[in-house]
Amino acid sequence: MITGQGITRTFPGRGSMLRREPVRALRGVDFTIPDGGAVSFIGESGCGKTTLGRILCGYEDFDGGDLVIDGQSLKALRPKDRVPYFRRIQMIHQDPYTALNPTRTIGSILADPLNLRARQTGAAAGWVRERGAELLGLVGLDPDYVLPRYPHMLSGGMRQRVVIARALTVDPEVLVADEAVSMIDVSLRLGILQLLTDLRTKLGVSLLFITHDVATARYLGTGGELYVIYRGMVVEHGDTDTIIQHPAHPYTQCLLSAIPVLRGIEEPGPDRMIPLAPLDERSQPPGCLFEPRCPLAAADCRAAVPELAQRDGSVQEHACIHPERRSVVAVSS
């Protein structure tokens, strides 16, 4: 199990030295990824969800809080001692067109991590190729066709399956899928999503899905947990289906209101809404961070930052002092 405890991450700002404001990408984020569970981080671009995924994989360091993996605090470890823990968490990158070395065959791309494992375990000769072929078969590809080919010879969907196979070479316990279907053809997305669901069932791996798409989060996260992130803060957390069917925080309601409705087939929820203004990343309101854009903002929203908690008998946790249950999701007509 992986637990984030008050994770913060701040980057240097842009501009002159005298007027440079730091960028707070994450502001005290708490989360839990259970063994074999499905967790989704959802939010608009720039909310901090990818930074959180990079911290989980060891690509970025956190400057506050702690990351606990199976009871071990990573804050207490030196960077080199964290490597075995991060090896158990593998990233499935967003862009399959740049994630694979174009000068190498798929067989050699998969062989690098497998050769390392073979040396560590004393595997027999021929194991690397056999394991590479097995992993390609696991992700629905023909090994005889794919192994000798270069990335440019494969379609986008096939490349993404190779990226997934490469992540599986080290037998990870957690897969972090960062917008894993956003760069491939719409007609191929469902196949990749179903593959990730099947891998979670077959291998028992935990799945963290990072996305801005409510539909994909719901497809992968059914029966799991959903974290809604806004400007580096979790503003709503709970069961995926509960949040999508009964959103409490206005930001979650705005995200759901942005889902297109098929005219003549669906009817929009009666309370769909959009933010009042575009996001100004430089603004630092004294209270709720969503208050300048919130259609439901009141004067007391500026008093203090609301804590993430259960309010008014809600099942999920949310950070709004004036939650309203609203019907924003499209329904069949």
Label every model-predicted segment.
Residues M17, G238-S333:
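Charged, flexible cofactor/metal-binding loops and thiol motifs
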